[in-house]
Amino acid sequence: MTALNRAVASARVGTEVIRVRGLTFRYPKAAEPAVRGMEFTVGRGEIFGLLGPSGAGKSTTQKLLIGLLRDHGGQATVWDKEPAEWGPDYYERIGVSFELPNHYQKLTGYENLRFFASLYAGATADPMQLLAAVGLADDAHTLVGKYSKGMQMRLTFARSLINDPELLFLDEPTSGLDPVNARKIKDIIVDLKARGRTIFLTTHDMATADELCDRVAFVVDGRIVALDSPTELKIARSRRRVRVEYRGDGGGLETAEFGMDGLADDPAFHSVLRNHHVETIHSREASLDDVFVEVTGRQLT
């Protein structure tokens, strides 16, 4: 663990929102457990990602933390209590956005949010402001049954924010969204973090996780096989090489690679910089996808 990671871990002590220790769960009649001995913590104001292929145990873990599944082994506490120990006040403090939309199809988007707002005892957000934030203002008074899947996904996300939750559970938050609307959702998530909210997301989209998450855990067959910040995971498995694209003597684009160790004293590297027009310089960094495949031996399918 780096000095920075130790500092982050130290700062997390006393501000833990989620603590999971030895968590196991088996569905009735299932041959194998869906979750096997998971251990992790999530600190206040952190975006934590549980990453893995379909069937890895991500959504099951999330459902256990939300309180939708019971009878697990080990410990899974939120604000120092198991979800089953909380009363209705637990759901006043959390927001949930499921991957599969579940709305009242014969109500409008606005009416759906108004209805769900009425279920909370505390103050709630303005439905129109939430709809505008996710790009649905023009469709606020359209029946949800006429919404596309992507529109329903955005409505689900907006609904999860209606009670201004302290802790947000997101399941594949950008799945099926076009780049413009996916960016809207990502920007809202980043803003929530800046306001001190805690976000627990599950996804198999490594690019989204890399962009948003402070830390990620790779999950395969119900087990966590790696856990760290995306940057640390990538650095640990990156090739220490620099790739330079430059214009050759004839004007064509040429490429050269140099080792990072001793780069400051590499005469060939300095010759390229001095004598050619450099277009790009990049370290040969592994992607989070690359790291996942290397660590787990699995593809994200």
From Swiss-Prot:
Compartment(s) of residence: Cell membrane
Domain of life: Bacteria
Chain residues that bind ATP: 52-59
Record bears the keyword Lipid biosynthesis: no
SUPFAM superfamilies, per the entry: P-loop containing nucleoside triphosphate hydrolases
One GO term describing the cellular component: plasma membrane
Membrane topology recorded in Swiss-Prot or TrEMBL: Peripheral membrane protein
Assigned EC number: 7.6.2.-
GO MF: ATP binding; ATP hydrolysis activity
Domain ABC transporter: 18-246
The family this protein is said to belong to: Belongs to the ABC transporter superfamily.
Function: Part of the ABC transporter complex involved in fluoroquinolones export. Probably responsible for energy coupling to the transport system.
Subunit text: The complex is composed of 2 ATP-binding proteins and 2 transmembrane proteins.
Name this polypeptide is given: Fluoroquinolones export ATP-binding protein MT2762
